C-alpha cells in the first residue's frame, strides 16, 4: 500500500455551515465569513503550521508554470463570482484537489488545473474573462469515479468535491438558478465509490488515539492506546484498547486504507521509528494528520449517525454499549465519527452499533509475519494470486470473502467459538449434497450491507430493492432448508444451527410487498438501458453524429415500475393517464385516417421531438405532401384547430396541432406525477430497510458466516484436510503436515508431490532445523505457522493429524527485511525484528525464526543465534522453530555450556541432499533427527549457472 504523508488540516473546515453560493450572485460569497471564523479557530496553530512547512499547492508548481499563471490569471478582486467561490475553496482546502461542478462537468482551475490535468490525462486550456485568462481543465460528471480513483488511489491526494444544485422555486431560464456547496471530501478511507465496486475487501478508516504528551517521554510498551476503525461502505465500526507493543499487530490485522492521527504528533515523525521502532510500519499506509475536535463535544451528540431501530432504541443501546468502552476507546470513536461526518456532510451516515474487540480474543500477527506467510499477497510480486487467502478462498458471497480475510488477519482465541466452527464445517464436509444446495442458494445473495449503505446515503437503484428483497427471501429459504435437515445433526450442532439461523427469519411482509408492487422486469430493462448509456459515455460516443430522425421518439405508452394498486393516489393517477392515453389513441386513429386515407400520405406518427415539441410526423410522395401544404396554406381547421408546419423536406413534414400539443403535455405531466409518486414509494421502501438496519446486517453477517464455513468444507474435500484438535495446551503436534500454497504450485506445474513432515513442539522444547540451501527449511517453518492460523479460524488443516494448543501471538523472522528502516543495515533490521519477538512472545506464542545472525561475521552470528535460542527457551518459553546453518556450532555450545536439562529440550532435525550418481542430485525435504553438516552451497551455485572455473576454485578452497 502506498504511503502518503499529509500536512495538518483543520478538522472541521466546512461541515458546520452549508456553503451555498450562486454562480451569478454579485455579493461576496458566504464562504468568506466562514473562512475568517476558521482562521480564528486555527489561529493558535498557525505558527506551528508555518514552522512545520505547511505547503500551499500553488508553491509546488515550476517557475515556468508560475510565470504562466501570473501573466494570465485575473486579480482575485476581479474574478467572477463562480471563480471567486472556487478560489476561496482552494484557499480553504490548501492540501486538497478541488473539483467544482459546472453544468455537466467537474472542473479544475488556476494552478490546480496546470498541476493535475497532466496526471488525469485531460486537456488543459485557458478561459478568457474580461480581466484576463484563467487556466482550467475538466471532465464529464459521469467520469467522476474514474478520475477519483486516479487522484485518491494512484496519486494519494485528498479531493474536495463541490456539487451544483438548482435553487428551489427558480425558473429554468433564470441566470442565477444554481448554487454550489461542498458535498464530500474523498480520501482512501472515505472513498465510497471505490468501496461499492470492490466488494471483496473492506475499506477501513483507522483512528489511533495516543495519550496526551506521551511522545515527549521514552516509549513505554505497556502504554494504552485507543483505536477505532470503520468501513463507511458497510456500516461496520469497531473500537479497541491495545498496548503500544501490540499496536502494529492490530494495524496489520485491520489493514486500513487510511490512518488518522492527531496533527500534534506530526513533529515527532512517529513513522520514522525514532520514538518507537515498530511504528516504522506506518510507512506502508496512507496517513492523515488532522486537528482533532474539542473534547467538550459529548459522545451522545453522535447518536444520529446510528440507526438501530428507532431513536429511542438506538439511544438506549448506544448508552449501554458506550458504558463498556474505555476513555481512550471513546476518544478514538469520537474522532472517527467527526472525521466521517465532516468528510461526508451530504450523506446520511448509518453505522451499526460499535463493536468492542478485545486483544485477548484475537491472535496477534504482526506485519512481518503476515508478509512472510503471504496471508493476503505474495512476497515476490505483491500479487493476491498465490497468497493463502487466494489458495483457500471458496466463498461465493462478498460478505463471506470479507469475513474470511478478517479471520485470516486475526484468528480466534475463543476455544468455544473455534469448536463451534469446526462442528459446522464437519457437518458440511460430510453432507456434500446439503453443502452444494446451500452454496447454490448463497450465490443468489447480493451484498446486503453495501446495498443498505447505498440506501442510507440516498443512493441505490430501485432494482437494488428487488435484489435486497430476493436476497432476504433466499435467506428465509436457507433457514428453512437447514432446519429441515437438523435430523442429521447431533444435539449440540442442531442447537447451534437453530440459533444461528434465527436471524435469517426476516420480516416476510416487507419482502412480499416489494416483490408484489415493484415491476422487476421493467426495472431490469431500465438498468440495462442505463448501463448501455454508461458504456456509450465511457467510450465517448458522440450522440451528435446520430441522424436527426433518431432523436425524435415515437410517443409510446410508458412502462412504470410500481404496481398502480399500491395506493389510491397512484391508482387515480394511472386511471387518469389511461383515460388521456385513450384519447390520444382515438386522436391518432382519426389523424392517420385523414393523412393516410384521405390525403394519401405513406405514414403518420405522433412523436415527441428532442426539443420537447409534440409533433405530427408525416411521410409521403411529392403529390401527397403538396395536398398537405395546400390544406395548411388555407388554414383549414381540423377539430377546431389548424395545422402548422414545423419542419419539412422533400419526403417529410413535421406538423403541430393544438390537440396533440395539449394531449402530449397532459400525458407528460401525468407521467411526471406518476414518476414522482413512484420515487416516493421507492424511498419509502428504502426507509423501511434503513429502519431495519440492525436486522438486515444480522442477516448479512449470518450469510457470510455460513458461506465461509461451507467454503471450508469444500476446501477440506478438495485438498484432503483434517479437523485439528484445538485445546488450551501448549502443544503443537502435526503429523504429515503440508504447505498448502507450495503444494498447490507443485500440482499446477505437474512437478513432484509435496514432501510432508511431522512437527512436535511444546513450551519446554524447541526444534532447530538444519539443511542445505533450498532444502525446505523455510517452507517447513511457514507451513506449521499456517496450520496454526487455519486451525484457529475453524478451518481444517493440511496434514494427517494435528493438535494445536491455542496460540496467542504468532511471530516470524523469515525472509528478507522490508525496506522501511532508512539508513539501517540488513543485520540491524533483523536484530530489531528479533528483539520484538524476544520482548513480545509469551508461553502461548509460536515463533518461527530463520537464519538469525547470518548478517554478520560467523563467530558473532553464532553467538547471537545461541543467545536468541536460549532466551526463547528459558525466558519466553514459547513454541519455537529455529532454522539455521549454525547447527553444529550451536550443538557444541549447548553441550559445553548448558545443563543437561536444556540440552534435552533442544531437538535438532535436518533435511538433506540425495546423490543420484555423477553430478546429479536431488533435495530430500524429509526431516530426520540430526544436524546437516554442510549446506551444499557449491551445488546451488552450479544450479544457478556459475562459471565452471569459479566452481572449480570454490571446490579447491573448500578442500
Swiss-Prot record:
Molecular function as annotated in GO: ATP binding; ATP-dependent activity, acting on DNA; ATP-dependent DNA damage sensor activity; dinucleotide insertion or deletion binding; double-stranded DNA binding; guanine/thymine mispair binding
Residue positions binding ATP: 771-778
Pfam families: MutS_I, MutS_II, MutS_III, MutS_V
GO biological process: DNA repair; mismatch repair; mitochondrial DNA repair; mitochondrial genome maintenance; mitochondrion organization
Transit peptide: 1-21
Any one GO CC term of the record: mitochondrion
InterPro entries, A to Z: DNA_mismatch_repair_MutS-lik_N (IPR007695), DNA_mismatch_repair_MutS/MSH (IPR017261), DNA_mismatch_repair_MutS_C (IPR000432), DNA_mismatch_repair_MutS_core (IPR007696), DNA_mismatch_repair_MutS_N (IPR016151), DNA_mismatch_repair_MutS_sf (IPR036187), DNA_mmatch_repair_MutS_con_dom (IPR007860), MutS (IPR045076)
UniProt subcellular location: Mitochondrion
The entry's keywords: ATP-binding, DNA damage, DNA repair, DNA-binding, Mitochondrion, Nucleotide-binding, Transit peptide
NADP recorded as keyword: no
SUPFAM superfamilies listed in its UniProt record: DNA repair protein MutS, domain I (SSF55271), DNA repair protein MutS, domain II (SSF53150), DNA repair protein MutS, domain III (SSF48334), P-loop containing nucleoside triphosphate hydrolases (SSF52540)
Function as written in the Swiss-Prot or TrEMBL entry: Important for mitochondrial DNA (mtDNA) stability and repair. Recognizes and binds to base-base and small insertion-deletion mismatches in mtDNA. ATP binding and hydrolysis is crucial for function. Binding to a mismatched base pair attenuates ATP hydrolysis. Also involved in proper sorting of mtDNA during mtDNA transmission.
Binding partners and assembly: Homodimer.
Family: Belongs to the DNA mismatch repair MutS family.
Protein name per Swiss-Prot or TrEMBL: DNA mismatch repair protein MSH1, mitochondrial
Lineage: Eukaryota, Fungi, Dikarya, Ascomycota, Saccharomycotina
Gene designation: MSH1
